[in-house]
């Protein structure tokens, strides 16, 4: 019994020491605000004065890197992410992974474009995924415009349609992977920020006005909708059952990005506007059953063809982005020009 008591005492002593060391380690780590400030200092040493405080940040999602063409070629400054302190290198095909500073539209508004983003499924922490957003805040950005490629859950959506987001489901956050988890940094915002109006209404109104102007000048069958984005961790595309669940929960599109950035941007007081490009239609039908008589007699190739209908793939995502590039560029240019 004495030996057991001694062992228990040692265990509690070790647990207390481990907890104390963990707290001490956390206190020694530089805060996100400190790290973002160091990154901004590094960038401003290289930037001309008129680009040092961009008003708008634009995040280019999968297949949408062509948005960088909206930045005036004269005076443009750009760096690969790996050359910027604190920025992770993107490992996703279709994400160039670079920061681009310049001016845009006839108003010559200073902007910064993030061509590609870090994803949670790449193994990055939420802190790393959202670090670029915090850098934007320290730079002085007032408005963030985010784009992504997403799967369409709403049956009214077609591949190539654009969805202006008005709300989201943070599935990863609901199970503990939240970008604001941990000690709150008052330099950015309050401990419990409300998100009931995360997607700025006046910016969404501007988006619709801009879309109508674009359609008048460039007629197209492409439609713009307004809807709810479901954020999932990835990297697998959703199962049929998961798609039905998300649809029943009220989601119109589903993807693996954007929401952590939105949350951190709103926590920091920036206005946000976000668009999803529908790059595939999610499969909501149930998986064919093994005893389905209509499947009897089909060859292995015929069965594979039936099961592959509507299955998402990254190449499809990139191709849809290319096809929608002109409309997305025209929309973004009109919005930025009126900010």
Predicted regions span which residues?
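Generic non-transmembrane alpha-helical segments
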Residues: 42, 46, 202, 206-218, ...
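Structural motif
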Residues: 54-57, 109-113, 142-145, 161-163, ...
């Amino acid at each position: 019994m004495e030996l057991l008591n001694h062992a228990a005492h040692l265990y509690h002593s070790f647990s207390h020491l481990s907890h104390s060391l963990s707290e001490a380690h956390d206190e020694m780590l530089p805060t996100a605000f400190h790290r973002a400030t160091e990154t901004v200092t590094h960038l401003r040493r290289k930037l001309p004065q008129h680009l040092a405080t961009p008003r708008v940040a634009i995040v280019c999602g999968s297949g949408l890197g062509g948005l960088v063409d909206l930045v005036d070629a004269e005076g443009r400054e750009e760096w690969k992410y790996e050359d910027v302190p604190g920025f992770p290198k993107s490992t996703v095909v279709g994400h160039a992974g670079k920061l681009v500073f310049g001016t845009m539209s006839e108003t010559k508004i200073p902007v910064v474009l993030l061509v590609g983003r870090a994803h949670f499924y790449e193994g990055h922490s939420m802190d790393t995924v959202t670090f670029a957003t915090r850098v934007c805040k320290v730079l002085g950005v007032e408005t963030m415009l985010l784009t992504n490629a997403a799967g369409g859950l709403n049956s009214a959506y077609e591949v190539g349609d654009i969805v202006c987001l008005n709300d989201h489901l943070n599935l990863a956050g609901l199970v503990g992977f939240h970008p604001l988890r941990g000690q709150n940094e008052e330099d950015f915002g309050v401990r419990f920020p409300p998100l009931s109006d995360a997607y700025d209404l006046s910016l969404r109104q501007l988006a619709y006005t801009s879309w109508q102007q674009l359609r008048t000048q460039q007629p197209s069958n492409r439609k713009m909708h307004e809807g709810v984005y479901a954020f999932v961790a990835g990297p697998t595309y959703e199962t049929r059952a998961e798609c039905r669940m998300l649809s029943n929960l009220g989601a119109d599109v589903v993807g693996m990005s954007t929401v952590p950035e939105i949350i951190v941007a709103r926590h920091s007081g920036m206005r946000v506007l976000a668009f999803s490009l529908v790059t595939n239609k999610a499969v909501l039908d149930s998986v064919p059953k093994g005893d389905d008589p209509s499947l009897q007699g089909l060859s292995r190739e015929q069965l594979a063809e039936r099961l592959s209908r509507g299955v998402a793939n990254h190449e499809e995502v990139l191709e849809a982005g290319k096809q929608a590039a002109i409309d997305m560029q025209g929309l973004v240019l009109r919005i930025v020009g009126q900010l």
